[in-house]
Amino acid sequence: MTAVVERLAIVGLGLIGSSIARGARTYGLAREIVAIDRDAGVIERVKALGLADVASTEASAVAGADLVILCVPVGAIGDVAAQIAPHLKPGAVVSDVGSVKAAVVAAVTPHLSEKNPFVPAHPVAGTEYSGPDSGFATLFSNRWCILTPPEGPTRRRSSGCRACGRGWAPSSRP
């Protein structure tokens, strides 16, 4: 599969984030994978598992990413968006994997500029396990990923997220 993005940043490396990293690596979604987590222990585990090319506890590690996927608890997503926003390159698409959308959109969009569209997403997949060791590349295989981009220019950017859905698991429906 051809890489969809040059640099993919995943913020939060629990089950979903680590599965995205594994899928991106397995299916060639990105030329470079960046893993960001506030927990240094998680970052050390990510390095040991070889889930990313770059692994950091710093929000600034999103710099240069074409796509940033927020894989953090819904209650923390606004704070995380505020931390990464100053480091986003113009044109970088920001997405999430939260199970609710209205609260996430309300928490994230005030921190992003028009140059960084937000495309909310909800991959309908998961297990009862958590942490970077629990992820697996096929978590999203034959699963839905619901995209909820707002009306307007951002909707045109959702093709990048649809492509990422294919990259996480080529057999999934974008």
Predicted regions span which residues?
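Internal alpha-helical scaffold of NAD(P)-dependent oxidoreductase catalytic cores
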Residues: 139-174
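Residues at the starts of beta-strands that form the adenosine-phosphate
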Residues: 7, 32, 117, 144, ...
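A short helix->loop->beta-strand "cap" motif at the edges of active sites that frequently abuts
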Residues: 30-31, 88-92, 114-116
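Rossmann-fold NAD(P)-binding glycine/threonine-rich loop
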Residues: 97-137
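Rossmann-like NAD(P)-binding element
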Residues: 58-95
